[in-house]
Amino acid sequence: MTEVKAPPEIFDARLLALRRARAAKRQDSFLMQRALSDAADRLLDVNRNFGKVLILGTPSIEAELVSKLPKEKFAEIICCETLEQLPQDNDFDLTLSLLRLQSENELPGAIIQLRQNLKPDGLFIAAMFGGDTLTELRQVFYKTDEDIMGGLAPHIYPMANYTQAAGLLSRAGLNQPVVDTDRFTVSYGKLETLISDLRDLGETNVLKERPDTVLTQNYWAQFKKNYQKMFSREDGKLNCSFEILWLTGWSPHKSQQKPLKPGSANIHLGDALKTMKS
């Protein structure tokens, strides 16, 4: 009998929990505020209220989201800070996760778990950082590692791209899967502000294979020089890219519209285009 191997642990779960606990005591991240506003807009576009809602995140997220929506949108909310705290119930109308899943060791399993919490025709929505996030920071780490240490060390963890995110939804068995992206660039007056924004989310380096020594003042001095040289604007501010992937899907239900089989359309593409032009 073949032994099933556990997925590799990319993240230090203990350190991640500690960082997130500290982040909960800090000011709300502007990145989380952006995700919350976008989530509220998406929920307002859904023409239904949700009786029972499961949120993967901190209680502050629950309060912020509720404040942006009509009172009748949610009847009952259960908020869990970790996957281990998720209930066994499968009767939720909505499961929602904001900027948490990118740090899960077993991302496919996490989405499957949240999908299993849904009742038929329940809605899954998640926002997580995508592969273009912190691309400038990543490249500056590469350059500085080479300059100072003569080799590369792990600093920023890998993140899913658009195609991978779509595959995760299909693998979880969600119907009508949709992935869209929110890409934006932030200009920072100094590097310390960028680091502070990441700490506000608890998203600094929690890789299990992270360097076991503290980066020196000499390293950070060279890092700042490299960042300024490689990714600064004319006014001296530092550019940093972010990408938030939005994943949406529905728990299967017989009432849902099914995609047509190839060749089953009852109108030709040419006729459709003529109709559009007329």
What are the residue ranges of the model-derived segments?
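Adenosine-cofactor binding site in Rossmann-like domains, unifying the SAM/SAH pocket
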Residues: 75-87
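Conserved SAM-binding loop of SAM-dependent methyltransferases across substrates and taxa
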Residues: 60-72
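A short acidic, Gly/Pro-enriched loop at the edge of an enzyme's catalytic core
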Residues: 85-95
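Class I SAM-dependent methyltransferase Rossmann-like catalytic core
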Residues: 1-49
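Conserved catalytic/acceptor-binding region of the Class I
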Residues: 127-191, 201-214
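C-terminal lobe and adjacent flexible extensions of AdoMet/dcAdoMet transferase-like proteins
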Residues: 40, 44, 172, 189-278
